[in-house]
C-alpha cells in the first residue's frame, strides 16, 4: 500500500479496517494495533473505515458480525484521530444480522440512519473542531479495552469496548476546567492535569469546549419498520415516523 500512496498520493487502508473490526469483536482496543495503519513509512494519506460495501456483503460478512453498537465505537476511534480520512458506509435500510438487504432495498431509498446517531454526529463534529490539532493516543495502564484520543489541548475522545463500565483517573493535556460530553451531556472535570470519571460499557465520551457549535439534532423521517417496500395491490398504506 505504501507504493500506491507514493504513486497516487493516497490509498484506502482496507487492512486497517480489518484491524479495527477485530478490535471491536474482541473488545481489545490496543493502541499498538490501532496506530499501525499498515502503510510502512509512507505518508498517512489514507481513507479509513470500519467496513465497506465489500466487507458487508463479501467474505468478511460484516453484516452478521459487526453490530451498530460496534460501528459507533469504531467510527469514534477513526473520526477522533488526526490520521486518515474516514469513510462511513451506510448499511441498507433496516438491515440486521438476519436480513442483509434490509426491508426497503430499493433504488433511491435512503440507507440506514445510523449516521445520524448522536454519538456518530458528536464524533464528526469533534473531528471538524479538532482540525490541525496533534493527536496523543493511549490506553490506561490497566486496560486495553479503553482508548483515549487527545487532540492537542482542546479535546479528548474516550471509547470503551468492554462489556463493563470503566472508572478512569488519568493524566491529560487538557487545561484544568470543566468539559461537557457532547454525547451524554454530562460534565467532566480536569484538575491538576488529571481527569477522572466513569465511561459506561460499550460507549463513547466526546469532550471539548473550544470550537463547539450548538446544532439541532439530525432530523430523521422514515417509514414504519413494518413496511417492506413490496406490494402487489393498487395502493399501500404507509406510516411515517419523524424524529428530531
For the regions a language model picked out, list residue spans one by one:
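Short, solvent-exposed loop/linker segments at the N-terminal edge
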Residues: 225-234
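Aromatic/hydrophobic beta-strand junction motif of beta-rich domains
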Residues: 236-243
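Active-site-proximal helices and loops of the catalytic beta/alpha 8
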Residues: 1-213
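Proline-enriched interdomain boundary motifs that mark the N-terminal boundary
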Residues: 215-225
Amino acid at each position: 500500500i505504501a507504493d500506491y500512496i507514493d504513486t497516487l498520493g493516497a490509498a484506502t487502508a482496507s487492512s486497517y479496517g480489518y484491524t479495527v473490526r477485530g478490535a471491536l469483536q474482541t473488545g481489545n482496543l490496543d493502541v499498538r494495533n490501532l496506530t499501525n495503519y499498515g502503510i510502512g513509512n509512507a505518508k498517512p494519506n489514507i481513507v479509513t473505515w470500519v467496513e465497506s460495501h465489500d466487507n458487508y456483503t463479501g467474505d468478511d460478512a460484516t453484516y452478521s458480525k459487526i453490530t451498530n453498537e460496534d460501528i459507533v465505537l469504531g467510527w469514534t476511534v477513526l473520526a477522533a484521530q488526526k490520521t486518515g480520512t474516514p469513510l462511513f458506509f451506510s448499511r441498507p435500510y433496516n438491515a440486521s444480522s438476519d436480513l442483509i438487504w434490509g426491508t426497503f432495498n430499493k433504488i433511491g431509498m435512503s440507507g440506514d440512519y445510523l449516521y445520524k446517531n448522536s454519538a456518530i454526529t458528536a464524533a464528526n463534529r469533534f473531528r471538524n473542531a479538532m482540525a490541525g490539532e496533534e493527536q496523543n493516543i493511549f490506553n490506561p495502564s490497566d486496560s486495553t479495552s479503553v482508548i483515549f484520543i487527545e487532540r492537542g489541548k482542546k479535546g479528548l475522545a474516550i471509547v470503551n469496548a468492554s462489556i463493563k463500565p470503566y472508572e478512569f483517573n488519568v493524566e491529560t493535556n487538557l487545561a484544568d476546567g470543566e468539559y461537557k460530553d457532547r454525547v451524554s451531556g454530562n460534565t467532566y472535570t480536569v484538575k491538576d492535569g488529571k481527569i477522572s470519571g466513569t465511561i459506561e460499557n460499550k460507549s463513547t465520551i466526546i469532550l471539548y469546549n473550544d470550537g463547539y457549535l450548538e446544532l439541532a439534532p439530525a432530523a430523521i423521517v422514515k417509514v414504519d419498520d413494518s413496511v417492506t417496500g413490496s406490494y402487489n395491490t393498487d395502493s399501500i398504506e404507509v406510516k411515517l415516523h419523524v424524529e428530531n
